[in-house]
């Protein structure tokens, strides 16, 4: 998903937890029901984001969003992982918004700066790919129109 990672957190994010590790997080969450601690929810969300399954990654981002709203003391950590999770699911707009919010709190945070650079690079790459696809589609369309015009002249 990511080329050579700017920093270790991106590389680590690509490695899902083992089934056993994930089961431990889920068991901890279940053992604390009906009101699991914020840290337990955070750990579970982190495990979900590391997953290779898009729905689990989205659920992890959802849990972190809820934690951001309810746990003021965890906002710094939550913003960082919200940004990572959003990046992983391809939601670059929110990924950038979250990391920029973190940089407002901690302007010298090198991890956040590296993450912002990675997000900006992904946005640029995706934009160029989109332009290339649109340009290719336009060329094919113009070619077809040209062929039809030539055919109708005969």
Swiss-Prot record:
Q: Identify the stretches annotated as TPR repeats.
A: 76-109
Which species expresses this protein natively? Answer: Candida albicans (strain SC5314 / ATCC MYA-2876)
Lineage top rank: taxon: Eukaryota
- Record localization: Mitochondrion outer membrane
Query: PROSITE patterns this protein is in?
Result: TPR, TPR_REGION
Query: Might you report a single GO cellular component term?
Result: peroxisomal membrane
Gene Ontology annotations of biological process type: mitochondrial fission; peroxisome fission
One Pfam family name from the record? Fis1_TPR_C
What membrane topology does the UniProt entry give? Single-pass membrane protein
Q: Which residues lie on this side of the membrane: Cytoplasmic?
A: 1-128
* InterPro entries in alphabetical order: Fis1, Fis1_cytosol, Fis1_TPR_C, Fis1_TPR_N, TPR-like_helical_dom_sf, TPR_rpt
Q: Does the keyword Glycoprotein apply?
A: no
Q: What residue ranges are annotated as transmembrane?
A: 129-149
Which keywords does the record carry?
Answer: Membrane, Mitochondrion, Mitochondrion outer membrane, Repeat, TPR repeat, Transmembrane, Transmembrane helix
**Name the UniProt record assigns to this protein:** Mitochondrial fission 1 protein
Q: Which GO terms describe its molecular function?
A: lipid binding; molecular adaptor activity
């Amino acid at each position: 998903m990511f080329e050579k990672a700017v920093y270790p957190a991106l590389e680590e994010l690509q490695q899902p937890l083992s089934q056993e590790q994930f089961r431990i997080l889920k068991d901890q969450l279940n053992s604390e029901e009906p009101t699991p601690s914020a840290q337990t929810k955070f750990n579970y969300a982190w495990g979900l984001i590391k997953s290779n399954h898009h729905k689990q990654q989205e659920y992890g981002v959802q849990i972190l969003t809820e934690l951001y709203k309810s746990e003021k003391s965890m906002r710094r950590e939550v913003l960082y992982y919200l940004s990572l999770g959003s990046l992983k699911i391809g939601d670059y707009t929110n990924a950038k918004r979250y990391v920029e919010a973190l940089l407002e709190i901690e302007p010298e945070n090198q991890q956040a700066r590296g993450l912002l650079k990675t997000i900006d690079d992904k946005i640029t790459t995706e934009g160029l790919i989109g332009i290339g696809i649109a340009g290719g589609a336009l060329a094919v369309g113009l070619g077809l129109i040209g062929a039809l015009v030539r055919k109708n002249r005969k």
